């Protein structure tokens, strides 16, 4: 199973994200499932040499990297408005490039999150077994909250109940992208929550189900590079 991984990123002025991003990319390079390609998009990462240095953490045959010339959302918004829109444009650039290169299934990974080495292997195996178009593992905090103890549980994504870095979607099937909710809908609402809502609607309409793998394979780094929720 070929899997694309979309990672939007930017550089904080104090430079602290460099080490978080490095850890994130190292967690990808350590995956037991190796049939993947990373699409790393800099949202005007303002130190291009550093951006290229980070890109080299991944095998050159397994990465497409592009540093955008403009910080799209960060040039327009701040505070909550930036929090709900940040990375939308960069993510969609990565999704479009992955589709152009023939990938159907695209996994998301934020630049301050980590995957356990078996994350992609579990994702790939579950897709092969279920033929689902949406798959998620559990996060370290237990999301999504589920009562089922089965290893694979039928489920449809819900806003605020999904960690983006646990998900993998068939974007060719859903034909969907992140929306800038402020510009496109005139609502200050998180773009990823909006995406899960629209995926849910499509799945209900088509009478299809996604699945959750009942295993935690994702963790988040805090500003001191300590895992917060493994």
Where are these regions (language model features)?
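Active-site-proximal specificity loops/subdomain of glycosyltransferases
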Residues: 50-99
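Conserved donor NDP-sugar-binding/catalytic core segment of glycosyltransferases
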Residues: 121-149
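Short beta-strand-to-loop acidic/aromatic patch adjacent to the donor-nucleotide binding site
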Residues: 103-112
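Acidic donor-diphosphate engagement hotspot in glycosyltransferases and nucleotidyltransferases
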Residues: 102, 115-122
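Active-site donor/metal-binding and catalytic loop motifs
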Residues: 140-148, 167, 210-230
């Amino acid at each position: 199973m070929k899997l694309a991984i979309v990672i939007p990123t930017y550089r904080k002025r104090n430079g602290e994200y460099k080490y978080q991003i490095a850890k994130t990319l190292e967690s990808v390079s350590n995956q037991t499932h190796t049939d993947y390609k990373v699409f790393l998009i800099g949202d005007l990462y303002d130190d291009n040499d550093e951006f290229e240095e980070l890109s080299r953490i991944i095998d050159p045959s397994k990465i497409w990297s592009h540093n955008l010339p403009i910080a799209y959302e960060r040039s327009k918004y701040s505070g909550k408005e930036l929090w709900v829109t940040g990375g939308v444009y960069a993510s969609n650039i990565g999704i479009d490039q992955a589709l152009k290169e023939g990938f159907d299934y695209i996994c998301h990974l934020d630049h301050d999150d980590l995957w356990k080495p078996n994350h992609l292997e579990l994702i790939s195996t579950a897709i092969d077994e279920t033929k689902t178009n949406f798959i998620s593992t559990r996060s370290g905090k237990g999301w999504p909250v589920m009562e089922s103890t089965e290893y694979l549980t039928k489920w449809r994504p819900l806003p605020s109940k999904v960690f983006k870095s646990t998900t993998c979607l068939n974007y060719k099937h859903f034909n969907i992208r992140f929306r800038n909710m402020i510009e496109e809908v005139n609502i200050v609402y998180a773009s990823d929550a909006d995406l899960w809502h629209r995926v849910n609607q499509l799945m209900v309409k088509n009478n299809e189900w996604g699945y959750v793998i009942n295993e935690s394979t994702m963790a988040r780094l805090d500003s001191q590079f300590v895992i917060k929720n493994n």
